[in-house]
């Protein structure tokens, strides 16, 4: 019985320790298809490798939040880190700038990654 209690306490300690682990997210911004001015496309922001799961992701057009954005369900990898995909329809042109802004507990300030149409 004592052995069972010790094992249960060790399991609880290990599980509570998972919340203390923090991993900064990797942020990738890309379009679904190669960019062509005037041709509808999808802008994607893939955020991966982060822990804990509390995160805020915004897609931006010329520095302003895009309201009509969809996202995948929060999922986790084999290493228990999380990943998400945020996406929206957009039509690229030469004057507008697009980016993904991420707020996470591992950042002192939100991080913004610009979309590079040549990637």
UniProtKB/Swiss-Prot annotation:
Disulfide bonds: 45-100
Compartments where located: Secreted
Domain Ig-like C1-type: 25-114
Signal peptide region: 1-20
Gene Ontology biological process: antigen processing and presentation of peptide antigen via MHC class I; immune response
InterPro entries membership: B2Microglobulin (IPR015707), Ig-like_dom (IPR007110), Ig-like_dom_sf (IPR036179), Ig-like_fold (IPR013783), Ig_C1-set (IPR003597), MHC/Immunoglobulin (IPR050160)
Statement: the UniProt record of this protein carries the keyword Signal: yes
One GO term describing the cellular component: MHC class I protein complex
UniProt KW keywords: Disulfide bond, Immunity, Immunoglobulin domain, MHC I, Secreted, Signal
Main localization (coarse): secreted
Gene3D superfamilies xref list: Immunoglobulins (2.60.40.10)
Assembly and oligomerization: Heterodimer of an alpha chain and a beta chain. Beta-2-microglobulin is the beta-chain of major histocompatibility complex class I molecules.
Protein family (similarity comment): Belongs to the beta-2-microglobulin family.
Role summary: Component of the class I major histocompatibility complex (MHC). Involved in the presentation of peptide antigens to the immune system.
Name this protein carries in UniProt: Beta-2-microglobulin
Biological source species: Chiropotes satanas
């Amino acid at each position: 019985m004592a052995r069972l209690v010790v094992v249960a306490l060790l399991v609880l300690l290990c599980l509570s320790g998972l919340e203390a682990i923090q991993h900064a997210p990797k942020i990738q911004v890309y379009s679904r298809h190669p960019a062509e001015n005037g041709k509808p496309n999808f802008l994607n922001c893939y955020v991966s490798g982060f822990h804990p799961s509390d995160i805020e992701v915004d897609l931006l057009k010329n520095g302003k939040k895009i309201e009509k954005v969809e996202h995948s369900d929060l999922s986790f990898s084999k290493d228990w880190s999380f990943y998400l995909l945020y996406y929206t329809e957009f039509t690229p042109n030469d004057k507008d700038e697009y980016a993904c802004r991420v707020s996470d507990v591992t950042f002192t300030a939100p991080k913004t990654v610009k979309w590079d149409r040549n990637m």
